Amino acid sequence: MHTIEQIFINGEFVTPHGTEWFDLYNPATARVIGQVRLADEDDAERAIAAAKAAFPAWSQTTKQERIAALKRMHVAVAARHDDLLEAVIEEYGAPASRSAWMASYPAEVIAQAIEALEAFAFVTPAGAATVQMTPLGVAGLITPWNSDAGFICGKLAAALAAGCTAVIKPSEMSALQTQIVTEALRDAALPPGVFNIVTGRGETVGETISRHPDVAKISFTGSTNTGKAILRNAAESFKRVTLELGGKSPTILLDDVDVAQAIPLVIQAGFMNSGQACVAGTRILVPLARKAEIETALAQAVAAVKSGDPRDSVTEIGPMVSEKQWLRVQGYIRKGIEEGARLLAGGEGRPDGTRDGWFVRPTLFADVNNRMTIARDEIFGPVLCVIPYQDEAEVIAIANDTEYGLSAMVLGGDADRARRVAQQIVSGRVLVNTLAHEPKAPFGGFKHSGVGREMGEWGIRAFMEPRSVLG
């Protein structure tokens, strides 16, 4: 059993004022594997005060001093790779291929921030003026459970690169990852108060951070509903806000697509992170003339996807992170059937060979129209919908007929045509005949998928304001 009973404030591990204990589960077994003591409002206040006190000195550090600090962070986090790998499997249930990436990503994203900082121009000319990019102040960083260690390191690295100090509220469901990352960051020997990590509930710690007048910036990744609440809270003191929220991403198969080449990309995009990904391509838009062919190929591919023990090398989809999430996904599968969608693969219940744990059968629906609940709501599980279209104009209309706009993918034989379609999709990122990631490019969403951008120089700039100096 793991017991985590301290938070990190002003350069040291301290016992929280909060007294609530939160059970940690292994989602592959549904058994309790530990407990974490949660911080409360008083702890959040102490962390904010520490970050505020550290800001004047940190904001005056040079670029080279910040690069040196980030390099120490990178070395310290990279050294804990194996510990992170075990934690990701144990408390999150990520299968082997995904957990390996999740354990490497925290160090990788710090390295990416170092590269962005090295190229970042803090002072630029603008006619007769000089524009100075200045750090905002204390940044509140609120991270989700589906890749918590990576989000902690990515947001913190960008904030520190900009000259901000930080208070981090990680997900209480990811306490093992958080503990490992916190220990690593402590070992990087950053000045006290520059970063503070307080694990607690959103309605206490998160609420305090998003309302506090001494917090100048909020960076949040999570659900759209929580993002709306944070935006309302932040408006009281005109905080700058970056929100990376939900998605219902379309994967468009054009009528000239090579189906054999496309299907593996469709499956990877739809089932990434066991379907628990904001960018997952869960609406599969297919040409009516090739609907039967594509449905058959997809049904075979989905039926072949292995869901089960994350420690088994053949497993491609692990469990949902919690019983609550499992019940949510089961409810959406049931809703799809009730609304008239046709099951091509999967369905309610657990996959064959699994008894315990929060496993979901990889599920594929056909005969879906874009007004159905399963085509509108972000399910956050391994559930895909096939939606037919008549022509190019209709597929663009269907793709954009959503409150979200985070990611999309276009697959087609004519690359120029595919890019032309991509340019008409209302989305922060559109992939054309690839499933790739570019850390130098801005990442974020349109519409209800968020506000602002992260990654690369965009991520650093999000923690700063321009000051114009003349004369």
What is each PLM-predicted segment?
Residues M1-G127, V321:
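N-terminal Rossmann-like NAD(P)+-binding subdomain of aldehyde/semialdehyde dehydrogenases
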Residues F55, S59, H74-H81, L85-V88, ...:
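Structural signal for hydrophobic packing residues in well-ordered secondary-structure cores
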Residues A30, R66, V88, G163, ...:
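Residue-level signal for inorganic ion chemistry
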Residues I33-A39, A54-Q60, G140-L141, T251-L254, ...:
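Short, well-ordered beta-strand elements within core beta-sheets of diverse protein domains
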Residues N225-V368, V432:
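ALDH superfamily catalytic-core signature
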Residues F120-Q261, Y389:
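Rossmann-like NAD(P) dinucleotide-binding subdomain of oxidoreductase/dehydrogenase enzymes
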Residues P27, E41-A44, K63, V259, ...:
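Residues at or immediately preceding the N-termini of alpha-helices
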Residues T29-Q35, V215, I252, K306, ...:
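Conserved C-terminal structural/oligomerization subdomain of aldehyde/semialdehyde dehydrogenase
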